Amino acid sequence: MMQSADRAAGRSTGRTGSLGGTGITDRICLVIPYYEAGDDLVVSLTSVRMRRTDLIIVVDDGSQQRPARNLIPPTVADTPVRLIELEKNSGITMALRTGISSAPGDFAFIARLDCGDTCHPERFSTQRDFLSRHPDIVLVGSWVDFVSPDGSFLYRLEQPVDPTAVRKRMRVNCAITHPAAIFRREAYDHAGGYPTAYPAAEDYALFAQMLKHGDAANIPQSLVRCRTGDGGISDKKRRTQLVSRCRILLKHFDGHPMAVYGLLRAIGQMATPRRWSTWAHRIRVKLTGQ
């Protein structure tokens, strides 16, 4: 699996030379946004295995009933945890921007995780090593196992591995699963950070912009388990998300046939009930693995 990821990165288009070679440390800052998530935060933190020189930042987005301060330990497996508390609920985009802006300047990599999602023990060492060996890659994700609220396995999302395939998929939808992403801090800054103009699709908007500064890849191994089906953002704000996706596709539209398909597909999904799209997606995953 890892060899195929390395071969894929070796075929990257090399659109950046400096972003991977700044000489700063290879430390990771993991940013976890939190809002009234309770024990889901504990579940996520318990799964994290990083170096003691790394950092975990939890951003409490104005919780009143279940503030994160009552839940987080000072360290997780020797990795320090820092809490940032926002005075009022401002949304995930602002929480992420605040968390990342608070990361020490000499941390090369920013990682993401959502409350309730969990990591494979080797996630961070695998992705750190991959980015360290491939300076042209500014963003790396992995395959992801989706589970039900009770933890039952639903399906594995096998995102494209090759940087060329990632770019092709980005013309249709986001090719990097957000909670599995790790990216270079410098590329994030060059892209302008998480934009506020694309609600429910801030990850897609950021990653599409980051591809102007380098390549992206996915490690062909399931390194994250994501919980779904319990009222997450894709369920509550599906139409908002689809509108944002259309706007992102239009912003980066290049006339490629896949770009045309992606835009028409997003428009069609706005007229399709969520349960139909979910059913079709699961069938596609079973047939293609993607």
Which sequence ranges carry the predicted segments?
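Short, well-formed alpha-helical segments that are part of the catalytic scaffolds
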Residues: 37-50
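Catalytic core of nucleotide-sugar-dependent glycosyltransferases
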Residues: 167-169, 226-229, 235-259
